Amino acid sequence: MALPNKFFLWFCCFAWLCFPISLDSQPSRGEAQIVARTALESEAETWSLLKHLDGRHRPGLLSPLLNVLYDGHREPPRLQPDDRALSYMKRLYKAYATKEGTPKSNRSHLYNTVRLFTPCAQHKQAPGDQAAGTLPSVDLLFNLDRVTVVEHLFKSVLLYTFNNSISFPFPVKCICNLVIKEPEFSSKTLPRAPYSFTFNSQFEFRKKYKWIEIDVTAPLEPLVASHKRNIHMSVNFTCVKDQLQHPSARDSLFNMTLLLAPSLLLYLNDTSAQAFHRWHSLHPKRKPSQDPDQKRGLSACPMGEEAAEGVRLSRHRRDQESVSSELKKPLVPASFNLSEYFKQFLFPQNECELHDFRLSFSQLKWDNWIVAPHKYNPRYCKGDCPRAVGHRYGSPVHTMVMNIIHEKLDSSVPRPSCVPAKYSPLSVLAIEPDGSIAYKEYEDMIATKCTCR
Protein backbone atom coordinates (compact mmCIF):
# COMPACT_ATOMS: atom_id res chain seq x y z
CA MET A 1 0.00 0.00 0.00
CA ALA A 2 2.92 2.31 0.69
CA LEU A 3 4.25 1.83 -2.80
CA PRO A 4 1.08 3.04 -4.59
CA ASN A 5 0.88 6.07 -2.24
CA LYS A 6 4.47 7.04 -3.01
CA PHE A 7 3.86 6.58 -6.71
CA PHE A 8 0.73 8.74 -6.53
CA LEU A 9 2.62 11.45 -4.58
CA TRP A 10 5.48 11.39 -7.08
CA PHE A 11 3.01 11.67 -9.99
CA CYS A 12 1.29 14.73 -8.43
CA CYS A 13 4.63 16.50 -7.88
CA PHE A 14 5.67 15.81 -11.44
CA ALA A 15 2.36 17.14 -12.78
CA TRP A 16 2.68 20.28 -10.60
CA LEU A 17 6.17 20.93 -11.94
CA CYS A 18 5.16 20.42 -15.58
CA PHE A 19 1.94 22.40 -15.44
CA PRO A 20 3.55 25.90 -15.34
CA ILE A 21 5.73 24.96 -18.29
CA SER A 22 2.70 24.06 -20.36
CA LEU A 23 0.99 27.27 -19.32
CA ASP A 24 4.05 29.32 -20.31
CA SER A 25 4.36 27.63 -23.68
CA GLN A 26 0.72 28.11 -24.65
CA PRO A 27 0.63 31.87 -24.10
CA SER A 28 3.88 32.28 -26.05
CA ARG A 29 2.34 30.57 -29.05
CA GLY A 30 -0.84 32.58 -28.60
CA GLU A 31 1.10 35.83 -28.40
CA ALA A 32 3.02 34.93 -31.55
CA GLN A 33 -0.24 34.23 -33.37
CA ILE A 34 -1.69 37.56 -32.18
CA VAL A 35 1.42 39.46 -33.32
CA ALA A 36 1.37 37.75 -36.72
CA ARG A 37 -2.36 38.39 -37.13
CA THR A 38 -1.89 42.06 -36.19
CA ALA A 39 0.93 42.47 -38.71
CA LEU A 40 -1.14 40.89 -41.48
CA GLU A 41 -4.16 43.05 -40.64
CA SER A 42 -1.98 46.17 -40.63
CA GLU A 43 -0.48 45.28 -43.99
CA ALA A 44 -3.89 44.47 -45.45
CA GLU A 45 -5.26 47.77 -44.14
CA THR A 46 -2.35 49.67 -45.72
CA TRP A 47 -2.90 47.99 -49.08
CA SER A 48 -6.66 48.61 -48.89
CA LEU A 49 -6.04 52.30 -48.26
CA LEU A 50 -3.69 52.47 -51.22
CA LYS A 51 -6.09 50.64 -53.51
CA HIS A 52 -9.02 52.93 -52.68
CA LEU A 53 -7.11 55.99 -53.80
CA ASP A 54 -8.30 57.41 -57.08
CA GLY A 55 -5.63 57.28 -59.76
CA ARG A 56 -6.06 60.99 -60.45
CA HIS A 57 -5.04 61.88 -56.88
CA ARG A 58 -2.26 59.34 -56.43
CA PRO A 59 0.64 61.48 -57.71
CA GLY A 60 -0.14 64.19 -55.16
CA LEU A 61 -0.63 61.86 -52.21
CA LEU A 62 1.99 59.17 -52.66
CA SER A 63 5.71 59.37 -53.21
CA PRO A 64 7.07 58.13 -56.55
CA LEU A 65 8.17 54.81 -55.12
CA LEU A 66 4.83 54.33 -53.37
CA ASN A 67 3.13 54.99 -56.69
CA VAL A 68 4.95 51.95 -57.98
CA LEU A 69 4.05 50.07 -54.81
CA TYR A 70 0.40 50.93 -55.40
CA ASP A 71 0.48 49.14 -58.76
CA GLY A 72 0.46 45.97 -56.75
CA HIS A 73 3.64 43.97 -56.02
CA ARG A 74 4.97 44.89 -59.44
CA GLU A 75 5.72 41.86 -61.58
CA PRO A 76 8.86 41.49 -63.69
CA PRO A 77 8.74 43.42 -66.99
CA ARG A 78 6.92 41.63 -69.77
CA LEU A 79 9.86 42.24 -72.11
CA GLN A 80 13.53 42.31 -71.20
CA PRO A 81 15.77 44.90 -72.89
CA ASP A 82 18.76 44.06 -75.01
CA ASP A 83 21.96 43.50 -73.02
CA ARG A 84 23.88 46.07 -75.06
CA ALA A 85 21.20 48.70 -74.53
CA LEU A 86 21.14 47.96 -70.80
CA SER A 87 24.93 48.25 -70.68
CA TYR A 88 24.74 51.66 -72.35
CA MET A 89 22.16 52.92 -69.84
CA LYS A 90 24.23 51.64 -66.90
CA ARG A 91 27.16 53.62 -68.26
CA LEU A 92 24.91 56.69 -68.55
CA TYR A 93 23.75 56.21 -64.94
CA LYS A 94 27.34 56.13 -63.66
CA ALA A 95 28.05 59.36 -65.54
CA TYR A 96 24.97 61.12 -64.14
CA ALA A 97 24.65 59.80 -60.56
CA THR A 98 26.90 59.13 -57.56
CA LYS A 99 27.35 55.78 -55.84
CA GLU A 100 24.68 56.80 -53.31
CA GLY A 101 22.24 57.43 -56.16
CA THR A 102 22.06 61.24 -55.98
CA PRO A 103 22.42 63.27 -59.22
CA LYS A 104 25.90 64.69 -59.68
CA SER A 105 26.10 68.40 -58.98
CA ASN A 106 28.55 69.14 -61.81
CA ARG A 107 25.93 68.50 -64.49
CA SER A 108 24.56 71.64 -66.11
CA HIS A 109 21.88 70.26 -68.47
CA LEU A 110 18.20 70.72 -67.70
CA TYR A 111 16.73 67.32 -68.55
CA ASN A 112 15.96 64.85 -65.75
CA THR A 113 14.70 61.85 -67.74
CA VAL A 114 16.33 59.63 -70.36
CA ARG A 115 14.32 56.88 -72.07
CA LEU A 116 15.68 54.15 -74.31
CA PHE A 117 13.28 52.37 -76.67
CA THR A 118 14.07 49.31 -78.75
CA PRO A 119 12.06 48.86 -81.98
CA CYS A 120 8.89 46.86 -81.43
CA ALA A 121 8.88 45.89 -85.13
CA GLN A 122 11.54 45.92 -87.84
CA HIS A 123 12.17 44.44 -91.26
CA LYS A 124 14.79 44.92 -93.95
CA GLN A 125 13.75 46.73 -97.11
CA ALA A 126 16.82 46.32 -99.32
CA PRO A 127 20.02 44.29 -99.00
CA GLY A 128 23.23 46.06 -98.16
CA ASP A 129 26.61 46.08 -99.88
CA GLN A 130 29.45 45.29 -97.50
CA ALA A 131 32.09 46.23 -100.09
CA ALA A 132 30.55 49.68 -100.49
CA GLY A 133 29.89 50.05 -96.78
CA THR A 134 26.11 50.19 -97.17
CA LEU A 135 23.96 48.54 -94.54
CA PRO A 136 20.54 47.12 -95.32
CA SER A 137 17.75 49.69 -95.24
CA VAL A 138 15.63 48.95 -92.18
CA ASP A 139 12.03 49.83 -91.37
CA LEU A 140 11.59 50.54 -87.64
CA LEU A 141 8.53 51.08 -85.47
CA PHE A 142 8.94 52.60 -82.00
CA ASN A 143 6.16 52.70 -79.44
CA LEU A 144 6.34 55.75 -77.14
CA ASP A 145 3.47 54.98 -74.77
CA ARG A 146 5.74 55.47 -71.75
CA VAL A 147 6.37 59.14 -72.64
CA THR A 148 3.94 61.21 -70.58
CA VAL A 149 2.37 64.56 -71.37
CA VAL A 150 4.54 66.35 -68.77
CA GLU A 151 7.78 65.14 -70.39
CA HIS A 152 9.21 67.58 -72.94
CA LEU A 153 11.85 66.59 -75.47
CA PHE A 154 15.33 68.10 -75.31
CA LYS A 155 17.23 65.74 -77.57
CA SER A 156 16.69 62.48 -79.47
CA VAL A 157 19.38 60.07 -80.63
CA LEU A 158 19.53 56.91 -82.72
CA LEU A 159 21.88 54.53 -80.93
CA TYR A 160 23.65 51.88 -82.99
CA THR A 161 25.38 49.16 -80.99
CA PHE A 162 27.89 46.48 -81.98
CA ASN A 163 28.21 42.90 -80.84
CA ASN A 164 31.89 43.60 -80.27
CA SER A 165 33.89 46.80 -80.24
CA ILE A 166 35.25 47.55 -83.72
CA SER A 167 37.96 49.84 -85.09
CA PHE A 168 39.06 51.02 -88.53
CA PRO A 169 42.65 51.86 -89.58
CA PHE A 170 41.42 54.82 -91.66
CA PRO A 171 38.88 57.66 -91.29
CA VAL A 172 35.34 56.84 -92.33
CA LYS A 173 32.51 59.25 -93.20
CA CYS A 174 29.12 57.81 -92.33
CA ILE A 175 25.86 59.17 -93.76
CA CYS A 176 22.52 58.36 -92.19
CA ASN A 177 19.37 58.82 -94.27
CA LEU A 178 16.22 58.90 -92.17
CA VAL A 179 12.67 58.91 -93.54
CA ILE A 180 9.75 59.43 -91.17
CA LYS A 181 6.66 57.62 -92.40
CA GLU A 182 3.05 58.34 -91.64
CA PRO A 183 0.92 55.62 -90.00
CA GLU A 184 -1.51 53.55 -92.01
CA PHE A 185 -4.41 55.59 -93.39
CA SER A 186 -7.99 54.64 -93.93
CA SER A 187 -9.68 55.01 -97.31
CA LYS A 188 -11.38 58.24 -96.19
CA THR A 189 -8.16 60.10 -95.46
CA LEU A 190 -5.65 61.23 -98.03
CA PRO A 191 -2.11 59.98 -97.41
CA ARG A 192 0.60 62.57 -97.10
CA ALA A 193 4.01 62.16 -98.66
CA PRO A 194 6.73 61.09 -96.21
CA TYR A 195 9.30 63.71 -95.33
CA SER A 196 12.99 62.87 -95.40
CA PHE A 197 15.90 64.14 -93.34
CA THR A 198 19.52 63.41 -94.20
CA PHE A 199 22.30 63.66 -91.62
CA ASN A 200 25.99 63.79 -92.48
CA SER A 201 28.35 62.73 -89.73
CA GLN A 202 32.03 61.88 -89.89
CA PHE A 203 33.45 59.39 -87.43
CA GLU A 204 37.12 58.72 -86.79
CA PHE A 205 37.25 54.98 -86.10
CA ARG A 206 40.77 55.11 -84.70
CA LYS A 207 39.59 53.79 -81.37
CA LYS A 208 37.37 50.91 -80.48
CA TYR A 209 33.70 51.68 -80.64
CA LYS A 210 30.78 49.83 -79.11
CA TRP A 211 28.07 52.24 -80.23
CA ILE A 212 27.38 55.17 -82.54
CA GLU A 213 25.05 58.06 -81.65
CA ILE A 214 23.21 59.99 -84.38
CA ASP A 215 21.27 63.12 -83.42
CA VAL A 216 17.73 62.99 -84.84
CA THR A 217 16.15 65.74 -82.74
CA ALA A 218 15.00 67.84 -85.71
CA PRO A 219 12.67 65.26 -87.31
CA LEU A 220 11.36 63.79 -84.05
CA GLU A 221 10.74 66.93 -82.01
CA PRO A 222 7.37 67.83 -83.64
CA LEU A 223 6.21 64.22 -83.37
CA VAL A 224 7.02 63.90 -79.66
CA ALA A 225 5.57 67.36 -78.96
CA SER A 226 2.28 66.28 -80.59
CA HIS A 227 2.32 63.14 -78.40
CA LYS A 228 2.59 60.61 -81.23
CA ARG A 229 2.38 57.14 -79.73
CA ASN A 230 3.99 55.28 -82.65
CA ILE A 231 6.87 56.51 -84.80
CA HIS A 232 7.54 54.67 -88.06
CA MET A 233 10.86 55.41 -89.73
CA SER A 234 13.14 54.01 -92.42
CA VAL A 235 16.87 54.20 -91.78
CA ASN A 236 19.67 53.78 -94.30
CA PHE A 237 23.23 53.83 -92.97
CA THR A 238 26.19 54.20 -95.38
CA CYS A 239 29.89 54.54 -94.63
CA VAL A 240 32.31 55.89 -97.27
CA LYS A 241 36.05 55.25 -97.15
CA ASP A 242 38.44 58.17 -97.49
CA GLN A 243 40.40 56.90 -100.50
CA LEU A 244 42.20 60.18 -101.22
CA GLN A 245 44.17 60.28 -97.99
CA HIS A 246 44.37 56.49 -97.61
CA PRO A 247 44.73 54.71 -100.99
CA SER A 248 45.15 51.38 -99.17
CA ALA A 249 41.52 51.62 -98.07
CA ARG A 250 40.35 51.17 -101.68
CA ASP A 251 40.53 47.39 -101.64
CA SER A 252 39.63 46.82 -97.98
CA LEU A 253 36.17 45.67 -96.97
CA PHE A 254 33.95 47.11 -94.30
CA ASN A 255 33.13 44.90 -91.39
CA MET A 256 29.81 46.59 -90.68
CA THR A 257 27.76 43.43 -90.44
CA LEU A 258 28.13 43.60 -86.67
CA LEU A 259 26.02 46.77 -86.57
CA LEU A 260 22.66 45.95 -84.99
CA ALA A 261 19.26 47.62 -85.30
CA PRO A 262 19.29 51.01 -83.57
CA SER A 263 17.58 52.00 -80.35
CA LEU A 264 15.92 55.36 -79.81
CA LEU A 265 17.14 57.59 -76.98
CA LEU A 266 14.93 60.43 -75.77
CA TYR A 267 16.35 63.07 -73.42
CA LEU A 268 13.33 64.60 -71.68
CA ASN A 269 12.49 67.12 -68.99
CA ASP A 270 9.79 65.86 -66.63
CA THR A 271 7.88 68.89 -65.36
CA SER A 272 5.81 67.02 -62.75
CA ALA A 273 6.09 67.74 -59.03
CA GLN A 274 7.76 64.38 -58.30
CA ALA A 275 10.65 65.02 -60.70
CA PHE A 276 13.86 66.79 -59.69
CA HIS A 277 14.18 70.17 -61.41
CA ARG A 278 17.81 71.18 -61.75
CA TRP A 279 16.93 74.75 -62.74
CA HIS A 280 15.90 75.55 -59.16
CA SER A 281 19.25 74.35 -57.81
CA LEU A 282 21.19 76.30 -60.44
CA HIS A 283 19.16 79.49 -59.89
CA PRO A 284 18.37 80.02 -56.20
CA LYS A 285 15.46 82.15 -55.14
CA ARG A 286 16.03 85.87 -55.48
CA LYS A 287 15.84 88.16 -52.50
CA PRO A 288 12.68 90.25 -52.19
CA SER A 289 12.85 93.34 -54.33
CA GLN A 290 13.39 96.64 -52.60
CA ASP A 291 10.93 99.49 -52.51
CA PRO A 292 11.10 101.65 -55.66
CA ASP A 293 11.92 104.70 -53.56
CA GLN A 294 14.78 102.82 -51.90
CA LYS A 295 16.17 101.82 -55.30
CA ARG A 296 16.32 105.50 -56.29
CA GLY A 297 18.09 106.33 -53.04
CA LEU A 298 15.10 108.25 -51.61
CA SER A 299 14.03 108.08 -47.99
CA ALA A 300 10.80 106.23 -47.26
CA CYS A 301 10.14 108.59 -44.32
CA PRO A 302 7.81 111.52 -45.13
CA MET A 303 9.97 113.90 -43.05
CA GLY A 304 12.90 115.79 -44.46
CA GLU A 305 16.41 114.38 -44.40
CA GLU A 306 17.46 116.48 -41.41
CA ALA A 307 14.46 115.41 -39.34
CA ALA A 308 15.06 111.77 -40.20
CA GLU A 309 18.70 112.11 -39.18
CA GLY A 310 17.64 113.60 -35.85
CA VAL A 311 15.28 110.70 -35.19
CA ARG A 312 18.09 108.22 -35.85
CA LEU A 313 20.48 110.02 -33.47
CA SER A 314 17.93 110.18 -30.65
CA ARG A 315 17.10 106.49 -31.10
CA HIS A 316 20.83 105.66 -30.95
CA ARG A 317 21.22 107.59 -27.65
CA ARG A 318 18.24 105.77 -26.11
CA ASP A 319 19.71 102.42 -27.14
CA GLN A 320 23.04 103.28 -25.51
CA GLU A 321 21.34 104.32 -22.28
CA SER A 322 19.26 101.14 -22.12
CA VAL A 323 22.34 98.98 -22.71
CA SER A 324 24.33 100.72 -19.96
CA SER A 325 21.44 100.37 -17.51
CA GLU A 326 21.15 96.68 -18.31
CA LEU A 327 24.88 96.19 -17.71
CA LYS A 328 24.61 97.76 -14.24
CA LYS A 329 21.94 95.26 -13.21
CA PRO A 330 23.05 91.96 -11.62
CA LEU A 331 23.27 89.13 -14.13
CA VAL A 332 21.17 86.71 -12.06
CA PRO A 333 18.82 87.60 -9.16
CA ALA A 334 19.81 86.23 -5.79
CA SER A 335 16.66 84.12 -5.50
CA PHE A 336 17.03 82.64 -8.99
CA ASN A 337 17.64 78.89 -9.38
CA LEU A 338 20.60 78.48 -11.75
CA SER A 339 19.88 74.81 -12.43
CA GLU A 340 16.36 75.65 -13.64
CA TYR A 341 17.70 78.55 -15.69
CA PHE A 342 20.29 76.51 -17.59
CA LYS A 343 17.98 73.52 -18.02
CA GLN A 344 16.15 75.23 -20.89
CA PHE A 345 19.37 75.51 -22.88
CA LEU A 346 20.36 71.88 -22.49
CA PHE A 347 19.67 69.58 -25.39
CA PRO A 348 17.99 66.28 -24.57
CA GLN A 349 19.99 63.09 -24.69
CA ASN A 350 17.90 61.74 -27.55
CA GLU A 351 17.87 65.01 -29.43
CA CYS A 352 16.36 65.46 -32.86
CA GLU A 353 18.81 64.26 -35.51
CA LEU A 354 19.17 62.26 -38.73
CA HIS A 355 19.28 58.47 -38.65
CA ASP A 356 20.29 56.07 -41.41
CA PHE A 357 17.97 53.40 -42.73
CA ARG A 358 19.82 51.43 -45.38
CA LEU A 359 17.87 48.99 -47.48
CA SER A 360 18.37 47.13 -50.73
CA PHE A 361 15.71 46.89 -53.39
CA SER A 362 16.08 43.13 -53.29
CA GLN A 363 14.52 43.24 -49.79
CA LEU A 364 11.44 44.86 -51.33
CA LYS A 365 11.48 42.42 -54.25
CA TRP A 366 11.99 45.37 -56.60
CA ASP A 367 15.38 44.34 -57.97
CA ASN A 368 13.71 42.70 -60.97
CA TRP A 369 12.95 46.13 -62.44
CA ILE A 370 15.13 48.65 -60.55
CA VAL A 371 18.61 48.35 -62.07
CA ALA A 372 20.31 51.12 -60.06
CA PRO A 373 20.96 52.05 -57.36
CA HIS A 374 21.20 48.70 -55.65
CA LYS A 375 20.80 50.24 -52.19
CA TYR A 376 18.76 53.15 -50.90
CA ASN A 377 19.17 55.18 -47.71
CA PRO A 378 16.16 57.49 -47.35
CA ARG A 379 17.21 58.50 -43.79
CA TYR A 380 14.72 59.72 -41.22
CA CYS A 381 14.47 62.20 -38.35
CA LYS A 382 13.93 61.06 -34.80
CA GLY A 383 14.45 62.49 -31.33
CA ASP A 384 13.21 65.04 -28.83
CA CYS A 385 13.10 68.75 -29.52
CA PRO A 386 14.66 71.05 -26.87
CA ARG A 387 12.55 73.64 -25.06
CA ALA A 388 14.51 76.57 -26.48
CA VAL A 389 15.02 75.72 -30.12
CA GLY A 390 18.19 77.42 -31.27
CA HIS A 391 19.61 78.40 -34.61
CA ARG A 392 21.05 74.92 -35.14
CA TYR A 393 17.61 73.65 -36.12
CA GLY A 394 16.57 76.68 -38.12
CA SER A 395 13.15 76.51 -36.53
CA PRO A 396 10.71 79.40 -36.95
CA VAL A 397 9.52 81.55 -34.06
CA HIS A 398 6.22 79.69 -34.23
CA THR A 399 8.00 76.66 -32.75
CA MET A 400 9.00 78.58 -29.61
CA VAL A 401 5.46 79.95 -29.29
CA MET A 402 4.04 76.41 -29.43
CA ASN A 403 6.44 75.35 -26.66
CA ILE A 404 5.24 78.22 -24.45
CA ILE A 405 1.59 77.42 -25.13
CA HIS A 406 2.15 73.76 -24.27
CA GLU A 407 3.91 74.53 -20.97
CA LYS A 408 1.99 77.60 -19.77
CA LEU A 409 -1.50 77.52 -21.28
CA ASP A 410 -2.71 74.23 -22.73
CA SER A 411 -0.87 70.92 -22.45
CA SER A 412 -3.15 69.39 -25.09
CA VAL A 413 -1.33 71.44 -27.71
CA PRO A 414 1.46 69.13 -28.92
CA ARG A 415 5.11 69.98 -28.59
CA PRO A 416 7.14 70.60 -31.76
CA SER A 417 8.01 67.43 -33.64
CA CYS A 418 11.29 66.30 -35.16
CA VAL A 419 10.74 66.32 -38.94
CA PRO A 420 12.91 66.53 -42.09
CA ALA A 421 13.71 70.06 -43.24
CA LYS A 422 15.73 69.43 -46.40
CA TYR A 423 15.92 66.63 -48.94
CA SER A 424 18.10 65.55 -51.83
CA PRO A 425 16.93 63.87 -55.05
CA LEU A 426 17.46 60.26 -56.10
CA SER A 427 18.41 58.93 -59.54
CA VAL A 428 16.74 55.65 -60.52
CA LEU A 429 17.43 53.42 -63.52
CA ALA A 430 14.48 51.12 -64.11
CA ILE A 431 13.12 48.66 -66.67
CA GLU A 432 9.59 49.55 -67.75
CA PRO A 433 6.89 46.90 -68.31
CA ASP A 434 7.24 47.24 -72.10
CA GLY A 435 10.98 46.49 -71.95
CA SER A 436 12.14 50.09 -72.38
CA ILE A 437 14.72 51.54 -69.99
CA ALA A 438 14.20 54.80 -68.11
CA TYR A 439 16.61 56.99 -66.17
CA LYS A 440 14.69 59.36 -63.89
CA GLU A 441 15.54 61.82 -61.14
CA TYR A 442 13.00 62.05 -58.30
CA GLU A 443 12.71 65.03 -55.98
CA ASP A 444 12.79 64.87 -52.13
CA MET A 445 13.81 61.22 -51.75
CA ILE A 446 16.64 61.46 -49.17
CA ALA A 447 16.38 63.50 -45.95
CA THR A 448 19.48 65.63 -45.36
CA LYS A 449 18.53 67.89 -42.43
CA CYS A 450 16.16 67.80 -39.46
CA THR A 451 14.26 70.55 -37.74
CA CYS A 452 11.70 71.02 -34.98
CA ARG A 453 8.29 72.28 -36.05
Swiss-Prot record:
Which InterPro entries does this UniProt record tie to the protein?
A: Cystine-knot_cytokine, Growth_differentiation_fac-9_C, TGF-b_C, TGF-beta-rel, TGFb_CS
Please list the residues that make up the propeptide. 26-318
> Signal peptide span per the entry?
1-25
Q: What Gene3D superfamilies does the annotation carry? A: Cystine-knot cytokines
Record: glycosylation sites:
106, 163, 236, 255, 269, 337
Cellular component GO terms, alphabetical: cytoplasm; extracellular space
Quaternary structure note: Homodimer or heterodimer (Potential). But, in contrast to other members of this family, cannot be disulfide-linked.
What protein name is recorded for this chain?
Answer: Growth/differentiation factor 9
Misc = Ovarian physiology and fertility are controlled by endocrine and paracrine signals. These act in a species-dependent manner and determine the ovulation quota in different mammalian species. While humans, and mammals such as the cow or red deer, normally ovulate only one egg per cycle, other mammals such as mouse and pig can ovulate in excess of ten per cycle. The mechanisms that regulate the species-specific differences in the number of follicles that go onto ovulate during each reproductive cycle are poorly understood.
Q: Which organism is it from?
A: Bos taurus
- Kindly indicate whether the keyword Manganese belongs to this entry: no
Q: Which UniProt keywords apply?
A: Cleavage on pair of basic residues, Cytokine, Disulfide bond, Glycoprotein, Growth factor, Phosphoprotein, Secreted, Signal
A single GO molecular function term of this UniProt record: cytokine activity
* Cited function: Required for ovarian folliculogenesis.
Q: How is it modified after translation?
A: Phosphorylated; phosphorylation is critical for GDF9 function.
Where, by residue number, does the polypeptide cross the bilayer? none
